[in-house]
Curated annotation (Swiss-Prot):
It comes from the Bacteria. CDD domains: Ribosomal_L29_HIP (cd00427). Disulfide bonds: none annotated. GO terms for molecular function: structural constituent of ribosome. The lineage of its organism: Bacteria, Pseudomonadati, Pseudomonadota, Gammaproteobacteria, Moraxellales. One of its GO terms (biological process) is translation. Keywords: Ribonucleoprotein, Ribosomal protein. This is Large ribosomal subunit protein uL29. Belongs to the universal ribosomal protein uL29 family. GO terms for cellular component: cytosolic large ribosomal subunit.
Length: 65
């Protein structure tokens, strides 16, 4: 997900999306560990998306938005 799209979301929406992405990352890691994941780069994409969301949450909470 692009940062521009994430910036338009509220703090509550970002928190919900963060929970969803963390669950997705867990599932991807388990699939990779069991050898069922065909596209191993999806784990990296999920990790970077989580980092983007956390960064935006910190920015928004720091600015009081």
């Amino acid at each position: 997900m692009k940062t521009i799209d994430l910036r338009e979301k509220s703090v509550e929406e970002l928190k919900a999306l963060l929970d969803e992405q963390q669950l997705n990352q867990f599932r991807l890691r388990m699939a990779k560990a069991t050898g069922q994941l065909g596209k191993s780069h999806e784990v990296q994409i999920a990790r970077k998306t989580i980092a983007r969301i956390k960064t935006l949450l910190t920015e928004k909470q720091g600015n009081g938005q």
